[in-house]
């Protein structure tokens, strides 16, 4: 029996740091709403089901202008989010009726693609709990209440954690249920919930430094440029494949002609 893979896309944030008055997940990147890119990546992957978590007042808008408009057929439910990210994840997990694995992704990370999703699926099946990230390029300081440095962790031990964050479904669901029972709102990512309540080690694997989370106007500009570059490279790859195909046809024709002459 084939294992079922579900995904949760979080798009319920208010985007206060953006200062635009528009929830960041609906800001346009190359004429598409930001959350479009995450949904597109999952639509093009082997994920079976997508749960979209958004603001309660935005459910109808998401259905009509994003899910239906762009034919995201894998989105089976659009559910209202919670007061914090962890609550939105919990509601997303509650909306999944049946799954073996779940990938949890921030809708404000547009640089995800189907290739990264497939990588996530491979690693979660192998390790049960895994997270996309990248080794930190910068030195990180631990500071006190007055912003004085108190400790400098060894940089080679530090990673910048991203999403998707991927888990066995029952493992992460039970971990979140325990967290909610304890009224514990300290977790800043899903891996921390599983580390604390699931008693399972979380494997980190490399995604890409361009897998940024859009939270500021500067991030919008960066994401727009990166989407543009990705489209250019995609077109170049298509052109390259067409040239190879045409060359192969030409070689085949010449070989056939030489054979006929003999």
Placement of each model-derived feature along the sequence:
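Conserved N-terminal catalytic core of the sugar/cofactor nucleotidyltransferase
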Residues: 35-98, 182-183
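Short beta-strand segments
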Residues: 8-12, 53, 104-105, 132-135, ...
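Conserved beta-loop-beta/alpha segment of the NTase-like Rossmann-fold superfamily
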Residues: 76-77, 83-145, 162, 167, ...
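Short, high-confidence coil segments that cap the C-terminus of an alpha-helix
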Residues: 47, 72, 99, 126-129, ...
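Short beta-strand-to-turn element immediately C-terminal to the catalytic PLP-Schiff-base lysine
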Residues: 29, 141-144, 205, 214-215
